[in-house]
């Protein structure tokens, strides 16, 4: 079976789950990866390299395989021996976006598919904060970031590492689906030094504390043109956010870093 990945990236783990297959599971499996530019014929264009060697499987069990490759993949191929059922295949990795698709454009700097990620978070009781950076719209509350009710002083927050050093010009904070549990307000801070994220003085305001509506998308133009590598979202005091979008463009330094990662993982 060949799977085209959701985004090109470096694979660090593969999960082969044989849940509920007790008498008809494969005896073993192996996984290979390939990099195919564009949308060509994978069967003829791909040069496959091993990610997971042939490994034994058991029935009704979740098997996690660590991958040590530093090469970028666009496709993976699962082989099972000799046959049988697999409930789920999960391929975990780090997205490596193509610089040719980002250079000179305004795009969502906080999107997982563009290489962004959540690097810190105050609460993940109900769901992962990474949900907010996923493609498309949230259909239910579980597809966004929902915090527990905060019973102590303070507020909930998270920090997003952007696709690269960039200037953010527009923010979207979407509370769709959160009616009785949306934040009352939110703010955004920016930081341009990845080594100073723990220093409060390194952060500067992008969006002041602003009231939010429940079950509604919000768009805010940002006037601060200083480059940032990380953005902190604060919600007051807690609540759910379906999607966070941060639109802008890479700086020259940010584009150079994206190019470097692209070359290092396969050119």
Language model features with spans:
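Disordered, acidic Ser/Thr/Pro-rich linker "stalks" and the adjacent N-terminal cap
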Residues: 1-4, 94-163, 179-181, 250-267
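A short beta-strand element within beta-rich, extracytoplasmic domains
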Residues: 9-20, 78, 167-178, 233
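Predominantly extracellular/luminal cell-surface or secreted proteins
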Residues: 17, 32-36, 92, 174, ...
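Short, surface-exposed beta-strand/strand-loop-strand elements in extracellular ectodomains
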Residues: 22-37, 181-194
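Acidic Ser/Thr/Pro-rich low-complexity disordered segments
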Residues: 37-49, 103-108, 194-204, 262
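Beta-sandwich interaction modules
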Residues: 48-85, 155, 162, 166, ...
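Short, structured interface segments
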Residues: 86-97, 246
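Eukaryotic modular interaction domains in large regulatory/scaffold proteins
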Residues: 141-172, 177, 195-197, 202-218
């Amino acid at each position: 079976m060949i799977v085209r990945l959701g985004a090109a990236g470096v694979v660090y783990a593969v999960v082969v789950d044989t849940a509920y297959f007790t008498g008809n599971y494969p005896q073993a499996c192996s996984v290979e990866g390939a990099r195919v530019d564009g949308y060509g014929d994978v069967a003829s264009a791909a040069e496959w390299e091993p990610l997971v060697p042939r490994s034994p499987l058991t029935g009704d069990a979740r098997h996690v395989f660590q991958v040590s490759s530093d090469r970028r993949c666009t496709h993976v191929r699962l082989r099972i021996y000799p046959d049988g059922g697999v409930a789920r295949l999960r391929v975990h990795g780090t997205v490596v976006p193509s610089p040719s698709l980002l250079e000179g454009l305004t795009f969502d700097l906080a999107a997982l598919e563009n290489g962004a990620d959540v690097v810190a978070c105050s609460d993940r009781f109900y769901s992962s904060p990474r949900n907010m950076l996923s493609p498309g719209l949230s259909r239910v509350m579980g597809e966004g970031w929902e915090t527990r009710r905060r019973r102590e002083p303070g507020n909930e927050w998270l920090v997003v590492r952007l696709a690269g050093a960039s200037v953010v010009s527009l923010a979207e904070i979407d509370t769709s689906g959160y009616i009785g549990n949306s934040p009352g307000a939110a703010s955004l801070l920016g930081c341009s030094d990845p080594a100073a994220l723990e220093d409060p003085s390194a952060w500067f305001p992008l969006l002041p504390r602003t009231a939010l509506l429940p079950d509604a998308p919000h768009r805010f133009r940002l006037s601060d043109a200083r480059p940032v590598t990380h953005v902190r979202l604060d919600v007051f005091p807690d609540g759910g956010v379906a999607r966070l979008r941060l639109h802008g463009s890479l700086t020259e330094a940010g584009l150079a870093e994206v190019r470097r990662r692209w070359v290092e993982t396969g050119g």
